[in-house]
C-alpha cells in the first residue's frame, strides 16, 4: 500500500512541468516517510513497555493512515488545480492569438 503512493509520486513527477508541483509532491512524500518512521519507532517502544502497546499502536496507525490519505489527496488536488490553471492560461493565450496571411506570408499576432 505504501509503495502505491510512491508509484503515484513517480507518475506525477514525470507529468510535471512546474517546480512548484515537484516541491509539493516531494514535501508530501518526505513528510509521509518521516512520520511513518517515527510511528514505527513509537510502536516498537509501546510494545516493549506496555501491555496495551499493540492496541495503542493499531489506533495510532489508523489515525496515521487517515492523515496520510488526506495529505495525498491534498497533494493530488493541488496538482490538478495547477494543471487546470495551466489549461485556462493556454486557452486564453490561444484566444489572444490571431493569424494573418498576406501575400503568402503568415503573421502570428498576439493580442494584449
Curated annotation (Swiss-Prot):
Q: Which domain of life is it from?
A: Viruses
| Protein's UniProt name | Uncharacterized protein L117
- Organism (species): Acanthamoeba polyphaga mimivirus (APMV)
Organism taxonomic ancestry: Viruses, Varidnaviria, Bamfordvirae, Nucleocytoviricota, Megaviricetes
